[in-house]
Every structure is written in C-alpha cells, then in structure tokens.
C-alpha cells in the first residue's frame, strides 16, 4: 500500500499542476484577445443569441426562465457564498479541524481579493448592448460571480470528495460543483450583465485558484499541518 501511495501522489500532483497551468494559460489568452478587441464580434453574437429575436431588449424564454436565471446568478453572489463558506467553516471548527477551516477561509477570501484586483486592473466596461437583468456595481472582466462560484464550489466539492470513499460519489460531488459553477456563469450572460469572455475568464482563473488551493491543502495534509479527512469509518468502493 505504501508503494502505491508513493507512486500515486506525485501523479495526481503533476496532473493538478498541469491543470492549473492550462487554466492560467486560458485566462491569459482570453485576456489578451479581449484587450486587443478580437472578441468583440464573438461576444456580441453570443450575448444576442440569448435574447428574444423579436426584441433583443428581452431575454430569451418566458418570465419563469428569467426568474430562474436570477436565482442561479444569486448562487454566485457574495451573500450566498459567504453564508455557505461560513457554514462549512463552522462545521470544520466544531469537528476540531481548525487548520482545515483556516485553509478554506484563505482559499475563498484569497479568491475574492484576487477577483477584485483583476477587475481593477482590466477595468472593462459592462455590456451596454442590452438592458441589465441584475444590478451591477463593479467592472466586467473577469466575471466575479463566475470566478467566485468556481473558487467556492470547486474548493468545497474537492473537500467533500476527499471525505468520501466511493469513487462514484466523488464524481457526483465534483460534478455538482462544476454544474453550479456553469449555471452561475451562463446566467450572467443571459441577464446581459457580462460578455461571454468575462465569464470564460472568470471560470478559468477561478478553477486555477481552486485547484492550486486544493493542491496546497493536500500537501499540508500529507505533512500533518492540516487535519486529514476522517475516513476511519469508510472504505473505498465503486
């Protein structure tokens, strides 16, 4: 078992580092294209594709679809993500996993700070092509909702997946995290408050940050500096 563990850990670590690098490369590529104005036509086409053909001022679909989009977009808002993160941190503290709680706090708070700095740095205006379906207070690139959804849901999904012994349940947990992240991002374009490239960039840099934090947490767990998941009552199963 020890031999298998020694061989497996570096493989997963290298794969994770590769994914972090790929996500950062994607973000940098999108940012470069946006700054050069190469994505303007593509952004415009995709945004209008989600609007009514008869009246582009209206989002596609009936009123209940628009209401669902607002519900989905709220899942990436600061209030919802703060409450969710606080609940998880509270659970970890009650479970005696103080260092794990600190790691989650650093991951989410660090992502929020990074998102704010990137917005200030790029200072891209919001779309004015269609009316906004949600109130906005900051600049457009990258999408803060999309980025923070990726940071929070992927980080928490990875945390829960480590506790679970079943491969199928691990896949399910990570799939739910990805689905929530995608729904938040698509809703931002649907509501006309972000260009598609804002969302894609938010996903890319958010995933990179979440993966990096997950790799660091795994490393600290192996060194005993962060409490490992409690798997004493679970056995790996398919």
Task: Place the predicted regions along the sequence by residue.
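Short, charged low-complexity intrinsically disordered segments located at boundaries
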Residues: 73-82, 98-103, 147-148, 182-189, ...
